Amino acid sequence: MEQNLTRIFTLFGGLALFLYGMDALSHSLKTAAGSRLKSLLAAVTGSPVRGVLAGAAVTAVLQSSSAVTVMVLGFVSAGLLTLRQAVPVIFGCNIGTTVTAQLLAFRLEDVRGLVLLAGLLLCFACAGQKGRAIGRAVFAFGLLFEGIADMGTAMEPLAQGPVFVHWLSRVRQHPWLGLLAGLGMTLTVQSSSATIALLQNFAARPGLDGSSLLGLAGALPVLLGDNIGTTITAVLASLSASRDAKRVAAAHAVFNLTGAAVFCAGLPLYVRLTAALSPKGPELAVIARQIANAHTLFNVVCTLVWLPLTPLMVRFVCRLVPDRAVR
C-alpha cells in the first residue's frame, strides 16, 4: 500500500514538474521574443497561408498553443484581426503545437541534468534580460524531461499490473474508450502537450508480453481525444470576449472535432500511414516518435483540408454563434 502511494505521488509530482516546466518555458520565451511575436501576429493580412505560417511559427516558439490562441482572441476582440484573418492563424497554432511532441520524442531524459546545468549557467552568465530569459527557457526545457523521467519511474510497475493490462486491452479493442480517456485527461490537466507526453511515455513501456502497453493502434485514439480536449481553453477564454472571438474559439473546436471524427473513422489507415512515415525499429524504441508524427500528420492534413474552406468555416461559425437579434 505504501509503495503504491509513493508511485502515485511520484506520477503526479512528475506531471506537476512537467506542467511547471511548460509554463516556465512559455513565459521565458515570451520575455525573450514576445513583443516581436505579437507584432508578427498583428501584421497578418488577408493571406490565409501567411496566417497559418504566422500561427505555426509563434506557437512553435512559445511552446503553448493555448497562449497563442488566447492572444489571437484578444486581437480579434480589439479589432486588430478580422474573423477571416484569425481562423487560418488558429489552424497554424495546431501545427505549431506539434513541435513539443516532436522534441519530447527524442527521449533526452538521460541528459536532462546537462540541460538543467546549461540553463542555470546561462542565467548567471547573461547580463541582459533576454539572455537570462533564454537561460530560464533552457532550464525549463530540462524540467520537462525531469518530469517525464519521474512519470516513467512511477508507471513502470503499472505495466505489470493485471487489472491495468486488462483495461488497456479494452482500450485497444474499443477506440472510443481511448478517445474518451484522452479527452478526459486533457480537460483535467488543461494541457494537451502534457497528456501527449504522458501518452508517449506510457506507450513506450513494455507490457507482460514485452510489447508496448498500448501499441500504435491503441495510442492514436487517445491522441485524438487529446486534440479535442485542448479546444476547451479557447472556449473558456472566449466567454467574456467579443462575438467574433467566440467564433474563433468555435472554429478551433470545429477544426479538431471534425478532424478527430474523420481520423477515428479511418483509424486503420491512420495507423498504417503513421507507421509508413515513421522510423523503423523495435516498437518500444520508435513508438514515441510515431505518436509525435501522428500528431503532426493529423494537424497538417486537417489544415490542408480546411484552409481552402476558410470562407465556409467562417460562414458556419457565424451561424453557430449568430449576432444578437436587434429589438
PLM segments and residue spans:
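Alpha-helical transmembrane segments and their lipid-water interface positions
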Residues: 17, 27-30, 66-70, 97-105, ...
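Hydrophobic core segments of alpha-helical transmembrane domains in multi-pass membrane transport
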Residues: 11-23, 55-59, 117-126, 140-150, ...
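Transmembrane alpha-helical segments and their short flanking loops
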Residues: 148, 155-171, 237-327
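Helix-loop-helix hairpins and the membrane-proximal interhelical loops
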Residues: 2-48, 138-184, 202, 211
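Interfacial loop-to-helix junctions that mark the boundaries of transmembrane helices
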Residues: 1-9, 102-111, 165-170, 217-220, ...
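Alpha-helical transmembrane segments of multi-pass membrane proteins, especially transporters
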Residues: 15, 35, 39, 43, ...
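Membrane-interfacial helix-loop connectors
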Residues: 59-62, 70-94, 103-111, 119-124, ...
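Membrane-spanning helices that line or support transport/gating and their immediate boundary helices
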Residues: 20, 24-32, 36, 40, ...
